[in-house]
Structure formats: C-alpha cells, structure tokens
Amino acid sequence: MPDLAAGVAPAVRISKEQVTEVLEAWGKNSLAGTAFARSLYIRQSLSRSGQDASEAIKAELNRSLQRLSREQRRTTADLFQTGQSVRNVARGMGASESSVYRYRTAAIEQLAEEWTQLEAKAWRNYRSLIEERAQMGSSPLFGVAENLTVLRKALLDTDKAWVIGVDGIGGIGKTSLALAAILDHAILTRFDDVVWVSARQSQWHPVYGIVNATHPALTYASLVSRVLEQLIGAQA
C-alpha cells in the first residue's frame, strides 16, 4: 500500500501509536482522553456537529473501518472492541495467529495514513483561513528571527499576560511578523481558534512623515464586532 501520508509534516502526523491508543480506548469508552481527541480534525468536527469528543471519534472510526478489508475490520473489532485474545480471534476466523497480527498491523497502518491525511487537510484549510482573516499570505521574513523567537515564546508561555503587543509605525512588517508567529503549529494547537483584527492609527507620509489618524482606528465596539464576525463565519 502506498504511503498516503508521505511528505506530511511530523507535527500533524497521526502516529500508529496514537491509532492504537484510540483502538484500545474504543472498548473502554474512554476515547475523549486520547491524543486524537485533541487533533484539529476532531476539534473541528465537534464545532460542526455539536458532538462530544467520544462521539466524533467513534463516528470517524466507524467510517474508517468500513474502508478496511473484511479480515482487517473483523480482527480490529474482535481484538479491541470486544477485547478477545489473538488466539481466540484466530480460532474464530479459522486463521493463524500470525495472520491475525498481520491484519492488525495493516489496519493500524491504514488508519494512521488516513487520519494523517484528514489532519493535514484540516491544518492546510485552517492556515488558509487565518491568512484570509489577516488579509495577507504568509511570506519569508528577513532579519526578524530574534523578534519572532521572542513573540513565539510569549505566546506559548502560559504565565505571560493575556495581551501581547507588537508595536511600531505602519508598514514595518508587524502584521507579517504576527502572522508568522501565529502560523507556528505549536501555537495554533494551544488555542481553539484565532481571529484577526488589524488597525493602523498612524501611517508614513513621504512629505509629512508619520501622520496620526484624526479618529480612533479601532473602537471597542468595532473590535467586538469584527471578532464575532470571524467566529460566526467560521461556524457557518
């Protein structure tokens, strides 16, 4: 079988160990505590369907099992859902124990590949949504490695303040810097969602230099409105 997950970044890969964790939790009704429950794909499924994590994972597991071979599907259900031993499963199928292990391994590998593709697609779509909200695409940055490191560290530090400012005159790349930090996988996984509101209170004029706006570029009411528009739009 070709590796459908080839080329996918390790950060979004659903490993065989994570699949095994899901299958073992399947028969114990403890799916909500698995690593897969924290994946972006499942979190988005919860947002769309209103299901809890266990229901969402069961639904995805049932869909995925239907794409396995009959032997792989039966082996997976008997071993994990009903908790039978390899010996009993082999007897029930009229197969050797080595065949049961082979079906088990192949099933886990296929589930890992399929779920990795689902997770990778979810991340690609989410990154595109964030770039759309920021009204700009991600682009290479030069000479800002130190600033980017500081910003990423601040966003990942749970002891830091709730509000982190990126200050400077208009046009120096603050939005690009913030976008580059936000698109970091470790940062995106920390938050349920990211909304984007940008305001420019001053701008550079070639004759007059820095010119301040005569009215507030962003009010509290407009901030709340723009945040809600993005959150509601994402759930539509």
Annotated model-derived regions:
Residues 67-85:
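Short amphipathic alpha helix immediately N-terminal
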Residues 77-81, 112, 155-156:
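Short, locally clustered residues in the helix-turn-helix/winged-helix DNA-binding domain
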Residues 125-236:
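Walker A/P-loop phosphate-binding element recognition
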Residues 88-93:
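Short alpha-helical "recognition helix" segments of helix-turn-helix
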Residues 106, 110, 184:
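Alpha-helical DNA-recognition elements
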Residues 81-84, 100, 110:
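A short structural micro-motif
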Residues 1-68, 87, 99, 103-106, ...:
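N-terminal interaction/assembly modules
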Residues 58, 69-73, 148:
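Short, leucine-enriched amphipathic alpha-helices that occur as contiguous helical runs
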